[in-house]
Amino acid sequence: MFKPTVGPIIGHTTTNHARIFLRGKLQDTSLVFAGVRYRRLGEEHWSRGEFVKLTIVRDMSDVIALNELASDTEYEYQAGWFSPMSPVHTVETVQELPLQWPRDIYRFRTQSSKITTPRAYIVGSCRYLRMTAGIPSAPHLGDRIFASIAHLAQRTEPPISATLMTGDQIYVDDLNVIAPDREYKEILSKYRIAFSQPNISKLMSGTPTYMILDDHEIEDNWPANKSKTDDYLYKNAIAAYELYQASHSPAHELLSDGQISRKLEQYWYQFANGDIEWFVTDSRTRRNLSADDRRILDEEQEQALCKWLIHSPARVKFVVTSVMFYPDRKTLGDDAWKAFPEQRLRLLETIRTHRIKNVIFVSGDVHGSLTSRLTHSKDPDFEVHTIVSSPLCNSKLLPYAKASTFILDQPLAKTAAGDYRHELTSQVVSQDNFAHLVVDREHIQVNYHDRDGKPLQTINIPLA
């Protein structure tokens, strides 16, 4: 067996289930299989291998489901791919082969079943990896922050429950106005290179990783900048996104037989860790830019989000939106929620009128990090917070956001019932960074770190 050419990536992980993405390699006309075997840390004997047949339709990649795991337990696993001599093998018959597994042993931990135990998360976005003629130039620049994240994840308590990558995991357009990538094979190559750099590979092989797309997975400011010829680009970019980012997410349903459904109804999804729940929105591909019904989330998604906000018993509710919910930018804000004020106000009024507590909006996009509190002039019980974490690695062509980037001296929205007012609760971080969140009974601690892992600032968001 050979090491995966991309991965393994630990995706959606629960108390008893984990998803592992990996890619092999095309072998002319020969069959190719990928496999995973695992054991509890400290045990001697490996499980039987779980195998999947790889096909060119999925770029020789797939996701393997591990089921009936024990909660809050550390597992070791091995992963690899091979091409058997016989052309008639199946995923059942290859289990009997005397395979020599790759030496690398990876680890992951299942989620705790304790409802109120403290949880920790990593949040980041916008990882620029410069490509020239299909070859990464100075790839270590786009990878080094992941060494710092992996180092933190290995030594911190409570253990990291998940890494949230909230958009622009790759730059399909590469900030290239003259000749951006449009072909499917070019976009696939970008994913392979971006996700196989050593430090991000190490992090994703051991920490459950959840992703959602933003514009650069397609093109800058999509769909506002869409041209008549961009349907071809969109089809290719989305097909690659579905393989490399959505495939291991909860957007794919787990079937009763323990397999992952191939069907993908939408890109938005939910997941839960004890009394903490996440609703990861697709704020990019379901937009409606028409004047009579402008919306950043389609109607089905908005209804699902409001239903979840109102009825979920979760103590803490994180809403991920790849673009900023608030505060608004003074310029270049039309790609974010600023340009969709009616829908934003509907969400805020839902939270306020139903008296929903501990709602946190999490986003990236702006190449600056901050926390901010939103209050209401006539309703002292209303409070919402936002956590922004961006970028993991900036391009030298793009500026970092500063406090002066944002509109902070006027209400976010004015209504007959009162004004929504916001204020920064942190400094604005204007450098490459990531956020380490720790959620306990009393508060959410937001720790921003620079690309070398050094602490930049800590903010405590009180919980009701």
Regions flagged by a language model, labelled:
Residues 1-464:
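Metal-dependent phosphoester/phosphodiester hydrolase catalytic core
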